Amino acid sequence: MAKYFTSSHSKYLLKVHIIFCVKYRKPLLVRFGSQMKSIPLGVAASSDFSIEVMEVDKNHVHMLISYPPTLSVCSIVRRLKQLSTAELWRMYPNYLAKEFWKERTFWSDGYFACSTGDASSETIKKYIEQQG
C-alpha cells in the first residue's frame, strides 16, 4: 500500500520519472559518474523533494522523484540542472570549457517528465536501475 504524505491542508503522493540529457548528447557522464549521483542527492537533501532512485547513463540521467504539491516539476528540474551545472563547472572548469567552448552550460534545454500513474514505484525503480 502506498504511503501518503500529509501536510496542513493536503494529503498527497506525487512521484515523477525525470530524464535529462547532457548538451549535444556528449558522453560526459561516464567521466563524472560518482559526482552525478552525489550532486543531485545533495540538492534534494537541501530541498523539499527527494530522489528515490537514480541511474546515470553515458549522456543522460534517470530519476524517480517524490515531491509535495507546493513544487512544480519544472522548478525541481531547474534547481537540479542549475546547481549541478554550477558544481561541475566549479570542479572541472578547464575540461568543461574545452567541451562546451567556454559556454557555461552542461545540460540540454529540455527534459522528459512522466507521472508514475498506475505503475507501482517498484516497477519504475526496476526500470530506472536497469538504465545505467
Indicate where each model-derived feature is located.
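Basic nucleic-acid-binding interfaces
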Residues: M1-G132
